[in-house]
Amino acid sequence: MSKYMDYTSPEAQFFFDVNKNPLFKKDNQNLINILGVNQLNTLDNSSLLDIYLSKHNFVEPHYHQNAAELVYCISGGAVVSMLNPYTKEVLNFRISPGQVANVPQGWWHYEEATKDQTHLLAIFNASTPEVILGSDILKFTPSSVMAYNYCMDESEWIKTTEKVKPSTYIGPGCLEPERHLSQRQSHFTYSPYHYQYQPNPCYYRQCIPKTF
């Protein structure tokens, strides 16, 4: 929905330096800057994330409950993965400079850099994108609820998730010895996998939104 904007007002903003508005910084090679209506008030249902990643770093699994996301590769390379809730299929798209992958609103997705110095631009059809992060789901859902619903040992679940950092944004969130990084091979194979499923998937709207 378009908003009213008085373009004659001295408060109307037409320029902003996205480099000066970090959302998250893991290190100098892995960081996210943000532009939304809170930074540039003449934006009309558009916003973006300026994403820098080194090889094998991820934008962690997450979804945007209020916007679709168009991921454009500026440099380097990445795999954009998303779960299609209708087919229960994980779709993987390798993108290189000049290529895009589109993530529909509300779809669970993540990105992995396949090269160092990867630069991605994530464009949203919302003035400020909202996000639900996988790390927050893992960390803040009561362990008793997870254990009971999924028939797990609660103590094992607690142990497994104890190192999960809330709002990880860029993973892995654990520290790796520097000497291992250059030798590390990806542990992930990007071919779609399938589940047997029932039609008419359920959608849950009772969530706590995070606004960037």
Predicted regions and their residues:
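Short acidic-glycine-tyrosine-enriched beta hairpin
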Residues: 85-105
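Short glycine/proline-enriched turns and hinge-like loops at secondary-structure junctions
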Residues: 63-65, 72-73, 113-116
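A short, N-terminal "cap"/entry segment at the start of jelly-roll beta-barrel domains
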Residues: 1-46, 154-212
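Glycine- and acidic-residue-biased ligand/ion/polar-headgroup-sensing regions
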Residues: 66-84
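Conserved short histidine dyad/triad with adjacent acidic residue
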Residues: 49-66, 94-97
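Conserved hydrophobic/aromatic beta-strand scaffold that supports enzyme active sites
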Residues: 48-52, 70, 92, 100-102, ...
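Ligand-binding loop in jelly-roll beta-barrel domains
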Residues: 94-96, 105-132
